[in-house]
């Protein structure tokens, strides 16, 4: 079992600098570099994955669109959504891509269960769902045996921008969020519970909070 998993709490940061930093981290890390997970909220932005098609961007309006190098299609990030970027040496951990996705889904399902919310994964559509509505999205890139990008959990946010796209390429896909199912929630507490679940499902022994920037 690996030892300590490091987390960086980035607060709210624009998407592109974080994306560029995770690319640098992945490109420059050595075979002994510790894994990290970055937790962040983004200002409103649509990100279009490598499989994305222009027709799934219906009416982006004043929200910027960024073409990115993760798998999947278009999604939305905004305030009140908890994003976790998993910067892992998956080769060293011994995870296949499908295994890692399943671990991420189980992490989210157990987090939601801790709030009394029943959620499921779908074998043909990565992510986590409540009664058919999507509450969490997943998208990864593997480079040199290491992962970047990650997951996005809708906690307590404005869901309207999802109606401007076909989320993850699915026309009319309903979106939901934790606040609609669990009443009053604290964002920081959701983040803490996510950290604990990630440590558990990535087979780490413990966690620590990393200091310093990502530049």
Curated annotation (Swiss-Prot):
Reactions accelerated catalytically: octanoyl-[ACP] + L-lysyl-[protein] = N(6)-octanoyl-L-lysyl-[protein] + holo-[ACP] + H(+)
Catalytic site: 168
Record domain BPL/LPL catalytic: where: 31-206
EC number: 2.3.1.181
GO terms (BP aspect): protein modification process
Sites marked Lowers pKa of active site Cys: 134
Entry binding sites for substrate: 70-77, 137-139, 150-152
GO cellular component: cytoplasm
Record key words, sorted: Acyltransferase, Cytoplasm, Transferase
Enzyme class: transferase
Main location: cytoplasm
Pathway named in the protein's UniProt entry: Protein modification; protein lipoylation via endogenous pathway; protein N(6)-(lipoyl)lysine from octanoyl-[acyl-carrier-protein]: step 1/2
Record Pfam families: LplA-B_cat
CDD domains tied to this protein: LipB (cd16444)
GO molecular function: lipoyl(octanoyl) transferase activity
Role of this protein: Catalyzes the transfer of endogenously produced octanoic acid from octanoyl-acyl-carrier-protein onto the lipoyl domains of lipoate-dependent enzymes. Lipoyl-ACP can also act as a substrate although octanoyl-ACP is likely to be the physiological substrate.
Family: Belongs to the LipB family.
PANTHER family the record matches: LIPOYLTRANSFERASE 2, MITOCHONDRIAL-RELATED (PTHR10993:SF7), OCTANOYLTRANSFERASE (PTHR10993)
Other facts: In the reaction, the free carboxyl group of octanoic acid is attached via an amide linkage to the epsilon-amino group of a specific lysine residue of lipoyl domains of lipoate-dependent enzymes.
Name this protein carries in UniProt: Octanoyltransferase
Originating species: Pseudomonas fluorescens (strain Pf0-1)
